[in-house]
């Protein structure tokens, strides 16, 4: 029987291409051709479904829709999702209104001006005869460079009342005025803030006439106080405390926060930023103070109704729970 030949090139030991004849039988070629024709016929039949079959398929798809593949959407891919829903792993945070401060901002840069202002505040403190403690919100600002690190303490801001904030720029000063030091150490003044102890230590390093330890002993860290009163756990920033306690959002613009706080004069954005930090601190203090009074009242009523033993048992249970939370969050 005649044979068909296919020419294929092969390499010899000398890398010379030679032609090798491979015999292919005629009946093998016909079998391959027949198989291809059968596959083509089957595909044609598959594509020629009747209207009834097509309708049945559509009904099946409607009753049992294909499951969507669960995927963790990133911020970039989320916008491209068809349904536009956010990732289920993250809850949408509550939109809080931004803090708006409409009170006075008293800004001083000269040593004698700062001294006179501090003396004025101290006189006001001493007139508060109905209060054993006068809370003053305290905060500081300084320039920061990724090359050289934190600069010298440049701004001290305090809030005595919620309608008035004081901003003292220290850039020109070699020493902090004695009147301001006396105000900070006044027996009735209770300075408060977030991570306030670290601020006092930095102030002492930059201006040795300020002793940090006496201030640390009587100051109040708002985050620690919040955990005690509200039975929360973990560390707090001023921004998170504003969200949790005051239900307000803070505009912590990096451009302002990392700005040149040592340059005189401060611009309007810097002054507002500095004032809001201590203003909201005073708001948070008053809120936690009221919560503490309510808590103490409720505890007293519980003791009267259930006895000291029941109160101590409930208290111990709460402290155990808090300890577990702190282990996780710290």
Swiss-Prot record:
Primary localisation category: nucleus
Stretches for region Disordered: 1-92
GO cellular component: nucleus
EC annotation from Swiss-Prot or TrEMBL: 3.1.11.-
PTM annotation (Phosphoserine): residues: 79, 87
Alphabetical GO biological process terms: negative regulation of mitotic recombination; nucleobase-containing compound metabolic process
Residues annotated as domain 3'-5' exonuclease: 117-289
GO molecular function, a single term: 3'-5' exonuclease activity
Keyword Disulfide bond applies: no
Keywords: Exonuclease, Hydrolase, Magnesium, Metal-binding, Nuclease, Nucleus, Phosphoprotein
Protein name per Swiss-Prot or TrEMBL: 3'-5' exonuclease
Phylogenetic lineage: Eukaryota, Metazoa, Ecdysozoa, Arthropoda, Hexapoda
